[in-house]
Structure formats: structure tokens, C-alpha cells
């Protein structure tokens, strides 16, 4: 996408206005007519605390804005706000297309304005937020303003053990699509029972945002590492105005090269969308063939029952991994590709094969690089309410409070829908240290159902422990504590 004329990266220097409390914010702060001559400059992406605005706070499990007796969803009056502003240019040849503003990550509560009009709001800071902005922009110069509150109601679900800092943390960009375009797709790329032949399934949602019905066609090609086409398909469908239709493909491929940590073989999927015979867009994506299973082995435990193990491509797998946070002393939570690659190279040099995203989804590029390097990803929803602790009674953990079900579900769905097709995505996690209960029972069932016809990956949640809503339980922390607290020193 980045090489397309229908893509504009908005990273760089923006104008920035900061106040320690939202009460000190001028009423007309989003008016595009006001001067920004006395505003500061700020680098985007990059948290504002590492650029001289506000105070960075580190804490483990308390809410930094209400460390004692938290009362969700209430927030303090001394809630800092950062206002970002820059001009954007809408090319004339984007006219008649759908235009989107994409925020890859901003913390915490983000209000979006274009030319002074409110466009929308988002508060899931570690997932993408996307806004259709056709009716707010005109060809040529427009003014984009982001008003970001340091703390929002979403902060009650973002109580992770890391530096609590604020602002734009990932890329900001514009892109445009034809009215008749690809909306979403789902890739199944697993193996048959011989673990040699590949089972390839593709479902593509074609969307028509035009004013009249259109004949839409999806053509796909699957190419191996040498550029040879190993599978292809084409289907056409009539899509009414304002509607979405799905086309599906199913094919078995002999003797595929499998994807694993030891040999991360990738195929290239190229999807072409046509409208009335004319090419509208071309979308590439990497595909890896792997089969993920949890199943009994022939080896018996002391109780006479078979051991149950994790298998990849028919082989038992021992996970050797690390937790990873987004953190860099120069830019805060913004991680460049160069830094990501350094991390991955260190991991591979130390024979690691797994990375747990603690405790939120990472940037898209992170997953693409895991596909390339061969790392099993334990993806985790951006949910941790550790500051509420784990009491199942009313007023305790948010994980058992039905009033917070939608917030838990939205964050889980955001993670799943964005990341479901990456070959490295091996495990789903419902969150971390957020208690258990009704909300996590529901998110577990949702993910199991959503993934059952795609890759049927294990769904895990550490606070479930021995309850039914987790497919794996690995007491890693307690094991490390025991190992480090036995009073013996290794020589």
C-alpha cells in the first residue's frame, strides 16, 4: 500500500497544544481558523511525555490516575489533554472514492476533527481506529485535528505493567479505495492428515458503496517463493448498492512447503478486485501452511492417562519464548522496524521460537516480521484491569461485570479481525490479569466460534487458570519465582 498513489503517510512534525487538565482547554481549540503560531512542534509517532510534555509514570498494577479505591468509569478532573494538528491534502483524483483516516495506535481517548467537524472517537489504544471521512473533506487543503485525553474510560482496561504514557504511538495515514472494493478476507492455510498436502481456503467480502449495483469479480493467485503460480481462482458476483457479498475458494495443494519457526516458508497471495471487467485494486498478503493442534500423545502419565501436548505440523513443540513490550527511551512506545528487527535477531540468536505480546496487540509490521523470521505469536487482547483485582463479587473485577462486556468484546474482536490471517499467529489470548468471569466466558466462546473455520487456534487466558475458558495453562511466573527463591546460588 505504501507505494500506492492512494496512500499518504502523515508521520512527521505536527503542531501540538498541551494542558494539564481538560478544564484548561480553550473552547475553540478545534477551530481550524485559530492560529497555531504559539503551539509546540511534536514528532509523530512518539509519546508526548518523552518530548517534554507532562510526566511519564511507571507502575505495575495500580491505576496511576486513581491508585486507591478506583471507581470506574469515573476519571480525575486533572486529566491532561494533547491537541495535535496538521494540514492534509486530498488529491483531486481521490474524488469519487472512499477516503479513510487510519490511526494505528493512540493513547488513550481520541477525538478526531476535520475542518472543525467532529468525525469520531476511539479509546482502544493498541488497536487500529479507522474513520470514513468522505463527507468531511474537500479536494486540496484540509485541517486535521486530534484531541487526545491521557485517560479515558478505556484506561480501566489498560492497566498493564509498563510505562503509562500518552499520545500518538503508531503510524497515522490516509488511504482511498474505489466504491467497489475488498472489505475483508479470511485465509485458511493448514495441512491434511499426512502433514504434506496443503488445504487452502479463501473467503473474500466484496463491498459496493456505490449508488448502483455492480458486477464484481475476485481473482486470486497463490505464488511460491520462486514466483510460480501454484493455485488460482476466479469468481464473479452481482453486488447491490450498499451491500456486501462473499466469494469463497477451496483447494488442496500437493507437497507444500510448510511454515514453522525452523523453516518459515511463505507463499504470496495476490487478490485482484474487478468491477465490470476493470481492475479496481490489487491486494497482496503472505500465506504460510501450518497445522496447530493440541492432542494426546502415546506417552502415559502416572495416572495412566496420555499426556496432551502441543503440535505444529504433526511434530510436538516445546515453546521457548519471551514477553515483549513496546518501549524505546527515545520515542516511548513507538517502535521502528529497525528496532523490531534487532529484537527478532536477538531472539533467533538465542534459539527462541515464541513471543508473547504483553499485554496488547502490536503494530501490523510486527506480525509481518514474525511471519518472515519464524516466531510463534501469542497474541493478546488489549485488556488488563489489574487495579480492580480479582474479586468476582459486584464492584470487583471488571471481567465479571456484564456492564463491561461490550468493552471486553470490542477489544477482543478488534484483535481477532485485524490479525486473523498472519501465518505467525499461533495462539489467542483474551487478556492479562483482569480477573475471570462472565465477560471472559463470552469472549472465549466468541473467538472459538470465529476461528473454528479458519485456523482453529488455541484460545488462552492466564487468569482462567484451571477453568474451562482456556485451552492451555502455563504457570510460568510461579515457576520462575520458585526457581529464584530456593536459597541456592548457581556457581
Across the structure, where does each feature detected by a protein language model lie?
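Accessory carbohydrate-binding/adhesion or oligomerization-edge regions at the termini
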Residues: 1-65, 143, 147, 151, ...
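N-terminal carbohydrate-binding accessory modules
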Residues: 4, 185-186, 272-347
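Accessory beta-strand-rich segments of carbohydrate-active enzymes
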Residues: 17-21, 47-55, 74-184, 209-210, ...
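Solvent-exposed, conformationally flexible loop/turn segments
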Residues: 81, 139-140, 197, 240-244
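Short glycine/proline/serine/threonine-rich loop/turn segments at secondary-structure transition edges
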Residues: 94-98, 137-141, 253-268
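Beta-strand-rich binding/interaction modules
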Residues: 112-114, 197-238, 245-249
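Surface beta-strand/loop "capping" patches
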Residues: 179-210, 301-306
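Substrate-binding/catalytic cleft of secreted carbohydrate-active enzymes
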Residues: 344-347, 354-491
Amino acid at each position: 500500500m505504501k507505494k500506492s498513489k492512494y496512500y499518504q503517510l502523515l508521520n512527521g512534525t505536527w503542531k501540538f497544544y498541551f494542558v494539564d487538565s481538560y478544564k484548561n482547554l480553550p473552547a475553540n481549540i478545534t477551530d481550524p481558523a485559530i492560529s497555531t503560531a504559539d503551539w509546540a512542534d511534536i514528532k509523530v509517532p512518539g509519546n508526548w511525555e518523552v518530548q517534554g510534555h507532562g510526566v511519564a509514570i511507571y507502575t505495575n498494577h495500580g491505576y496511576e490516575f486513581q491508585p486507591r479505591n478506583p471507581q470506574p468509569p469515573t476519571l480525575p478532573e486533572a486529566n491532561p489533554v494533547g491537541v495535535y494538528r496538521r494540514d492534509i491534502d486530498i488529491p483531486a483524483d481521490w474524488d469519487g472514492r472512499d477516503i479513510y483516516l487510519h490511526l494505528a495506535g493512540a493513547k488513550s481517548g481520541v477525538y478526531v476533527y476535520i475542518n472543525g467537524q467532529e468525525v469520531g472517537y476511539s479509546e482502544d489504544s493498541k488497536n487500529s481506529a479507522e474513520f470514513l471521512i468522505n463527507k468531511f473533506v474537500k479536494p486540496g487543503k484540509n485541517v486535521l485535528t486530534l484531541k487526545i485525553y491521557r485517560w479515558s474510560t478505556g484506561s480501566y482496561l489498560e492497566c498493564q505493567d509498563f510505562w503509562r504514557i500518552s499520545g500518538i504511538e503508531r503510524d497515522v495515514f490516509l488511504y482511498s479505495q474505489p466504491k467497489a472494493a475488498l472489505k475483508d478476507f479470511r485465509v485458511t492455510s493448514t495441512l491434511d492428515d499426512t502433514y504434506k498436502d496443503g488445504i487452502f481456503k479463501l473467503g473474500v467480502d466484496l463491498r459496493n458503496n456505490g449508488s448502483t449495483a455492480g458486477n464484481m469479480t475476485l481473482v486470486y493467485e497463490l505464488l511460491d517463493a520462486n514466483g510460480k503460480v501454484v493455485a488460482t481462482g476466479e469468481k464473479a458476483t452481482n453486488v447491490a448498492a450498499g451491500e456486501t457479498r462473499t466469494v469463497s475458494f477451496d483447494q488442496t495443494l500437493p507437497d507444500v512447503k510448510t511454515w514453522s519457526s525452523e523453516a518459515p516458508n511463505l507463499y504470496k497471495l495476490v487478490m485482484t478486485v474487478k468491477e465490470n471487467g476493470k481492475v479496481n485494486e490489487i491486494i497482496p498478503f503472505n500465506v504460510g501452511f501450518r497445522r496447530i493442534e493440541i492432542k494426546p500423545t502415546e506417552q502415559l502419565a502416572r495416572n495412566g492417562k496420555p499426556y496432551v501436548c502441543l503440535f505444529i505440523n504433526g511434530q510436538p513443540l516445546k515453546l521457548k519464548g519471551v514477553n515483549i513490550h513496546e518501549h524505546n527511551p527515545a520515542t516511548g512506545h513507538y517502535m521502528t522496524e529497525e528496532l523490531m528487527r534487532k529484537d527478532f535477531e536477538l531472539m533467533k540468536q538465542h534459539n527462541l521460537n515464541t513471543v508473547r505480546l504483553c499485554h496488547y496487540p502490536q503494530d501490523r509490521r510486527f506480525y509481518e516480521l514474525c511471519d518472515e523470521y519464524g516466531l510463534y505469536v501469542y497474541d493478546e487482547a488489549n485488556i488488563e484491569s489489574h487495579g480492580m483485582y480479582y474479586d468476582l463479587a459486584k464492584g470487583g473485577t471488571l471481567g465479571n461485570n456484564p456492564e463491561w462486556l461490550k468493552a471486553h468484546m470490542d477489544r477482543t474482536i478488534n484483535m481477532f479481525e485485524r490479525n486473523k490471517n498472519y501465518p505467525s499467529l499461533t495462539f489467542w489470548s483474551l487478556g492479562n490479569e483482569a480477573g475471570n468471569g462472565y465477560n471472559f466466558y463470552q469472549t472465549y466462546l466468541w473467538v472459538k466460534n470465529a476461528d473454528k473455520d479458519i485456523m482453529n487456534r488455541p484460545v488462552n487466558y492466564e487468569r482462567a487458570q484451571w477453568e474451562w475458558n482456556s485451552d492451555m495453562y502455563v504457570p510460568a511466573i510461579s515457576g520462575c519465582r520458585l526457581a529464584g527463591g530456593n536459597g541456592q546460588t548457581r556457581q
